[in-house]
């Protein structure tokens, strides 16, 4: 049971429910193939049925960790830090990103955009979900839009979301892993017919790395 005092610090963003942190190769989207240090923050109520990290949903199962400790670990490994979840924007990201930027680190976020954007970000990957749509200014600020394709209806959703981002935003369609054999040919066909889109694959799963 987390005390009220600790929970206050979490709500302020001074501590965060840390699920895991690891140094690996970015497997998805624009920066795939590059080394980065990942910080996975617990807590998410978006509830995607195909989520591959459902253990991240309940923030109370992950230890509240000071952002100073998180930053000190991150700086040992990489100049590029990716904050993911869970849904990191559940929490105030300003204290963490201020700490990372003070050490001259590049800050990237992977988010559904379901909560207002906080933090100082060099790269924003917006991956919107139907059951809890993005809010606020994140559409204008996203550098890449990554839509997960589980069935043919997701192509319609992808176009609806693409209409809301800036012209400079890079557009990706990514197969949901469990249906990849069926859905990849559909994505390939769609991208060939609509070349503003690119294909994103979870290459880290093919490489068998985190």
Predicted features, each with a name:
Residues 1-13:
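Radical SAM enzyme core and accessory elements
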Residues 3, 16-23, 35-38, 42-121:
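Conserved Radical SAM active-site core
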Residues 26-29:
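A short beta-strand-turn-helix
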Residues 31-33, 139:
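A generic structural micro-feature
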Residues 71, 89-210:
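Conserved AdoMet/S-adenosylmethionine-binding subsite of the radical SAM
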């Amino acid at each position: 049971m987390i005390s009220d005092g600790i929970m206050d610090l979490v709500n302020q963003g001074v501590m965060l429910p840390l699920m895991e942190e690891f140094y690996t190769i970015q497997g998805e989207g624009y920066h795939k193939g590059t080394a980065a240090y990942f910080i996975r923050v617990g807590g998410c109520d978006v509830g995607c049925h195909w989520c591959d990290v459902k253990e991240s949903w309940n923030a109370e199962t992950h230890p509240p960790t000071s952002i100073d400790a998180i930053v000190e670990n991150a700086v040992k490994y990489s100049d590029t830090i990716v904050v993911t979840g869970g849904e990191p924007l559940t929490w105030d990201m300003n204290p963490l990103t201020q700490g990372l930027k003070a050490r001259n680190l590049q800050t990237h976020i992977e988010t559904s955009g379901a909560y207002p954007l906080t933090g100082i970000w060099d790269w924003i990957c917006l991956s919107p979900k139907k059951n809890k749509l993005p809010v606020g200014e994140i559409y204008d600020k996203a550098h890449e839009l990554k839509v997960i394709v589980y069935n043919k209806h997701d192509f319609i959703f992808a176009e609806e979301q693409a209409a809301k981002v800036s012209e400079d935003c890079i557009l990706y369609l990514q197969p949901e892993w469990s249906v990849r054999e069926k859905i990849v040919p559909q994505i390939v066909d769609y991208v060939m017919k609509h070349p503003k889109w690119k294909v994103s694959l979870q290459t880290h799963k093919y490489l068998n790395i985190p």
